[in-house]
Structures are given as C-alpha cells and as structure tokens.
Swiss-Prot record:
Record lineage: Bacteria, Pseudomonadati, Pseudomonadota, Alphaproteobacteria, Rhodospirillales
Species of origin: Rhodospirillum rubrum (strain ATCC 11170 / ATH 1.1.1 / DSM 467 / LMG 4362 / NCIMB 8255 / S1)
UniProt KW Secreted keyword: no
GO molecular function per UniProt: DNA ligase (NAD+) activity; metal ion binding
Protein's recorded name: DNA ligase
Residues annotated as binding NAD(+): 40-44, 89-90, 123, 146, 184, 300, 324
Length: 698
C-alpha cells in the first residue's frame, strides 16, 4: 500500500474511489444482512485510510465518501421510519496523541484558551446494534434501527420485548412531551454462549459473534423470536427532545437512570483530555473481564451549549469521537486470490482466506488493495499470513510468514485482461489501479452501474435487487437505466419470452408491486438523480453540492455542456464550488463528453423521469443567507473559520473559496488580504464578523 504522503493526486482519486465502493459493500453486509465479511478492525482501517487521503487531498472528497454517509439502507421486510434527527456515526481516533488532537480541534473551534478545562464523558463503546426509542408524554411509542442514519427499520414490537426497556417513564418530576432515547442493544457473552449451544443442539448454524447474534435477534419479523433471545441494552444519547432542558450530557444520563433506563456503569465524567486518556487505559485493562464486547471508548464534550456550537460535519458530531482499541491479529492461509470488477472498471484483488476468528469475528476475506500492494508484500496463494483488524477497519494482510511458504509457491500474476469480459486491463501512468477498458461491453461494469442506479440512496427501487438486475441484464431486458422504466411495457408485449409473473420466484402480486415501485420512482430530487448516474468521484455529498449550486436539472445539464472547455466560465464556476475542485470537475466534464452518457440521460427524460428542483432545508428558507454565495477571509475573533462556515451552510448558503462577480457576501476578519480588496473592486457586499453574526442569528 502506497503511503498517503507518497500518493499523487491521480493515485489518491483512484484509491478514494476504490475505498468508497468497498466500504459501501461492507456497510450493506454489516447493517442490512448482519453478515460482515471483515472484522471491525479491518473496516476501520479502510475508513481511516479514506479519511487520511481526504485530509491530504481535500479537493478529491467524493459524494459517496464514507465520511459523508452512515450505515446502510433499511432492509426489505421492515417498515421504514424517518428519524426526526439523524442518527449519526462517529469519527475515530486510535492513540493518545490523536485524542489530544481531538481536544485541540475542540479548543480551536470554540476559540478556548489553554487555561480552560473541557469536561468530557467517557463511555464504553458497545459492539451491538444501535436503536432510537421514542416516548410521547412518557409512553413508549416507537423504535427504529439506525439504518442509513436518516431512515431506519421499525422495530417497535421487537424492542418492547426487552425487559430492560421502560414502557412508561416514571419517577420524580414531569416527563418530556417528546423524548427519543438512543442506545445499543447487545448480547452478553454468557447469553451468546447459551444461544449458540441451543443453535447447535437444534442443528442450526451458530452465530459468528455476539454482535451478529444481537442484531439478528432484534431484526426478526416475528417479535416472539426476539423475545426468546436474551438481549440487553444501554442508553447513551438523545434524539428529538421537547420539554426537557439539561446543561450537560452527564446530567442527561443521570435523568435517564431515574426513568429506568440502563446506563453503562463504566461511564465516567472526565476533566480534560489527560483524564480521558487515563479512563481509556483503565477501561482497556477491564475489557476482557466485562461480560459484553466493547471495541473502544466514546469521548463526548459534556456541556450541551458547547455541543450545539460545535455542531456536525456530514456524518458525525464534532463534539464526540470514538477511541478504538488496538488491532487484534491472527494467522491463516490464503486459499485463493480473486479479482473483482467494480462499476468504474477498477480491478480489485481480494484474498480468500481459511476462515479464522480475530477478536471474536470470523474473517474469510481480506482486501489486497491493488497490484502494487500484492507485489510489495509478495502475497501468494497457499501462503500463511498474519491478518489484523484494528478498531473498525477492514481486515488486511499484515505480513507473509515466509518460513512457512510452500516450496512450490509461485508469485501471483496480476491479470492484464478483465476476468469478466476479456478486455484489456489498462493501468495509466501515475495510477495504482488497473481498469477494464471494456466500458459498456463489460457486463460487470454495466451490472454494477445499474445496481448503483436503483440503490437506496439513488432511485431506491424496492424489489429490484442485485440478483434481479443481473438476470434482466443477461436477458437483455435492462441494458441501460431507461430500460428499467420500460420493463412493464416489455413484459406486456405479446411476444415476451416469459412474463415476469410466471417466472420462478415471482407471481402476479410481486410483479405488480415491482412495476408500481418503478412507476413511483419516476419523480426524483435532483441530488439523488445526480448521484444515481454513478459519475466518478460524485457521491451523495458532492451530488448535493452540485444540486444546491445549480438548483435544477436543466441548469445543471446546460452548465455541464458549457464546461466542456476547461477555460470556460462554466468550468471555472464548477471547480469553484466548495469541495469540488479540478479533479472532480474533470470527471464531471468527462462524463458529459461521452455521447452514450448524454444519450442515456435523454433516454431517462424520454421515459418520463421527472427531476425535481433542489429543495433547500426548510429552516434555511427565511434566512438572508439562503441561496447566497459566501466567502470567508481573514481571522475571526468570536468564532473559528470552521464554525462560521458551518453556520452559513446550515442556513442555506453556498461557501466558496474564491471571490468572483457571482459572490454575494465576503465576510472579513483581521488580515483579510487580497480577497477583501478584490471584493471591494467588484463592488460586492463586504460584511464584518459582527454583521455576519447578526445576519446568521447572533
């Protein structure tokens, strides 16, 4: 693996693309199917590498970046619940120094001096399944899983079977009008052993680890199965709350205990970062003796007013972070090396391992990243290797045990042709990835692009899963996205080879439901439409930025056509969008430069797809900053630059890094420099920090 410091921009872009696809796949396996293929440590390693590359190359941050989304979509079979407030994930740190860096980031954001002590709360990070339980006037009403952070699965009846969950809030004083309690459902080690023994006695497959057992038990369509499993829970946070004011997170946890919620007794208030670090080491020493699995410690800023000021980044709060415990290792044999082909043609090698347990998780696969990584470590089929999982990172091969290498082993030869279509696998100068040159003739790419198109964050067509896409593509029924919307018409043709309703696994009702689901998705918001196209480096966050900037499909399409010339005003405007940059801009232009892509877009519109204009957050609608382009320059006195940008974005503004005639406001602090000068030359509105604070709500 090439160190981040040695990556070229092109290599970094390719690596981020690979990581986004790999992490998304493992999110689905973990959150939807409760069947992870890698350890938490291996997953964390992938996320960590992604974040390190993004920090080094901020202009390459993708919309589908793991730093911009949480979890995976709710599975079929469960009703969907939209969270009143998103259930976000957490960033990670792995060392004492990184914990201190977290503390310093908090200080910089809040503009605190070195004498001010930050109060924290340290909570054990339970390895279970997150939930949100809603109470109205003290009565339990609904519960949901995290899902993708915005929408989860309705587990109201299932969670009610847990004896740890209060059905009604009792105790001293009034109860809130609305209280969403968030926490983790888990299975103790003793209950896990007992459950697996029952599974074995019944001739059923045992669970791989307590986390899978807890998730699988809670996510049952029959609540009685959940009731039969011994599940526990700890409460640790709030969602939507009405009618309750607390000054600190610790005070909130104490209030939860008075209402009957279990709160982890290992939770500890800490004064300053050194106290946090000491608490982490103390808990690490107790880890093995605990009767439940933990994989780290969660650090939270205690003061609620500071939490509100700190706010959130795209997928996580700024005021909390997860400290992951060190990597756990094991040794196993490489049975095979498989090459996977992604939707953009990237060939990714994967080591197929003799299954081995690492830190309580059965691992059967490990990513080998790319051709250079295999060569550097000289990984061969038949080798005995050491693998590790560190925190939430995906399993990785650490080293080859050369003294145990078979005498007849041979170096792995990376293919120069696509294993799916036979086209050349080309490696461009300066890149680490080989890519299939087959394009649309490569069924692997075509199928993966179609799967992406119907995925939950794109068109979200329920009932049209990956296996169905593969079948319909192989039969020629769906070769491009527009074909999806013609599927019912094709099925009704008199000459159809086999009507969907008469196929194995289908029936009149399921066929009708699919056609209804397809029709219902003919109307789609602009940001989801852009994301669905599968443009390189354009994930959800980037798609939302583009949609917010151009507002309508017609305006975006026109701008992309005009941006075909790099020196054009349209191209300059595109790469000036916050977080876009030249690399993403070039990929967007390249997409529209291909005739077959433009034809595919036209075919979608001709098929009746209606792309809705971008809708800004309702709260931002009345803000004087809504829809305005804002540039910050100079040093601010009462808030950090990051806090100011976050405030502007939350109020519907577009924040860019350079001043142009299209800029609405330039907010200046001390030592503003050339940007202020240019703004005044252009006759733009220049705001002081005080004026910006007044405009943004004080």
């Amino acid at each position: 693996m090439i160190p981040v410091a040695d990556l070229t921009e092109a290599e970094a872009a390719r690596e981020l693309e690979r990581l986004a696809a790999e992490i998304a796949r493992h999110d689905r396996l973990y959150h939807q199917q409760d069947a992870p293929e890698i350890t938490d440590g291996e997953y964390d390693a992938l996320v960590r590498r992604n974040n390190e590359i993004e920090a080094a190359f901020p202009e390459l941050v993708r919309g589908d970046s793991p730093s911009a989304h949480v979890g995976a979509a709710p599975a079929e079979g469960f009703a969907k619940v939209t969270h009143a407030l998103p259930m976000l994930s957490l960033g990670n740190v792995f060392s004492d120094d990184e914990a201190r860096e977290f503390d310093q980031r908090i200080r910089r954001f809040l503009s605190l001096d070195g004498e001010t002590t930050i109060s924290y709360v340290a909570e054990p990070k339970i390895d279970g399944l997150s939930f949100s339980a809603r109470y109205e006037n003290g009565v339990y009403r609904r519960a949901a899983t995290r899902g993708d952070g915005t929408t989860g699965e309705d587990i109201t009846a299932n969670l009610a079977t847990l004896t740890d969950l209060p059905q009604r809030l009792t105790g001293d004083g009034p109860v809130p009008e609305v209280l969403e309690v968030r926490g983790e459902v888990f299975m103790t080690k003793a209950d896990f052993r007992a459950l697996n023994q029952r599974q074995i006695d019944a001739g059923a497959k045992p669970f791989a680890n307590p986390r899978n057992a807890a998730a699988g038990s809670l996510r049952q369509l029959d609540p009685e199965i959940t009731r039969s499993r011994s599940l526990s829970l700890f409460a640790y946070a709030s969602g939507e709350v009405k009618g309750l004011e607390v000054e600190s997170h610790h005070a909130f946890l104490e209030r939860l205990k008075t209402w009957g919620f279990p709160v982890n007794p290992q939770t500890r208030p800490c004064q300053g970062v050194e106290d946090l670090i000491e608490a982490t080491h103390a808990l690490a020493l107790q880890r093995a003796a605990l009767d439940y699995d933990i994989d780290g410690v969660v650090y939270k800023v205690d003061r609620v007013d500071w939490q509100k000021r700190l706010g959130f980044v795209s997928r996580a709060p700024r005021w909390a972070i997860a400290r992951k415990f060190p990597a756990e290792r094991a040794q196993t044999t490489v049975k095979a090396i498989q090459i996977q082909v992604g939707r953009t043609g990237t060939l990714t090698p994967v080591a197929i391992l003799e299954p081995v347990t690492v830190g309580g998780v059965v691992v059967g696969r490990a990513t080998l990243h790319n051709e250079d990584e295999i060569a550097r470590k000289d990984v061969r089929i038949g080798d005995m290797v050491t693998i590790q999982r560190a925190g939430d990172v995906i399993p990785q091969v650490v080293e080859v045990l050369l003294d145990q290498r078979p005498a007849d082993s041979a170096p792995f030869v990376f293919p120069e042709t696509c294993p799916v279509c036979g086209s050349h696998a080309v490696r461009q100068e300066g890149e680490v990835a080989r890519r299939c040159a087959g394009g649309l003739i490569c069924s692997a790419q075509a199928v993966e692009r179609l799967k992406h198109f119907v995925s939950r964050d794109a068109f979200d067509i329920e009932g049209l899963g990956g296996k169905h896409i593969e079948t319909f593509h192989n039969e020629g029924l769906i070769t491009q996205p527009a074909d999806i919307f013609a599927l019912e018409a094709k099925d009704n043709e008199p000459g159809a080879l086999q009507h969907l309703r008469s196929r194995e696994g289908w029936g009149p009702k399921s066929a009708e439901n699919l056609f209804k689901a397809i029709t219902a998705r003919k109307t789609i918001p602009l940001d989801r439409f852009i994301y669905a196209l599968g443009i390189r480096q354009v994930g959800q966050a980037t798609a939302r930025l583009l949609a917010g900037h151009y507002a309508s499909f017609a305006a975006w399409r026109k701008a992309m056509d005009e941006a075909q010339t790099e020196g054009s005003e349209a191209f300059a405007d595109l790469q000036n969008i916050e977080s876009i940059g030249p690399s993403v801009a070039r990929d967007l232009v390249a997409f529209f430069g291909e005739e077959h892509n433009r034809a595919a877009l036209d075919a979608l519109i001709d098929a009746g797809v209606e792309v809705l204009d971008f809708a800004r957050p309702q709260a931002a609608g009345d803000s004087p900053l809504a829809g305005k382009t804002v540039v910050f320059t100079g040093t601010l006195d009462t808030m950090s630059r990051g806090e100011a940008k976050a405030r502007a974005l939350a109020l519907g503004a577009k924040v860019t890094g350079s001043v142009s005639a299209k800029t609405d406001y330039v907010v200046v602090g001390a030592d503003a420099g050339s940007k202020e000068k240019k703004a005044r030359e252009l006759g733009l509105t220049v705001l002081s920090e005080a004026e910006f604070r007044a405009m943004s709500g004080g």
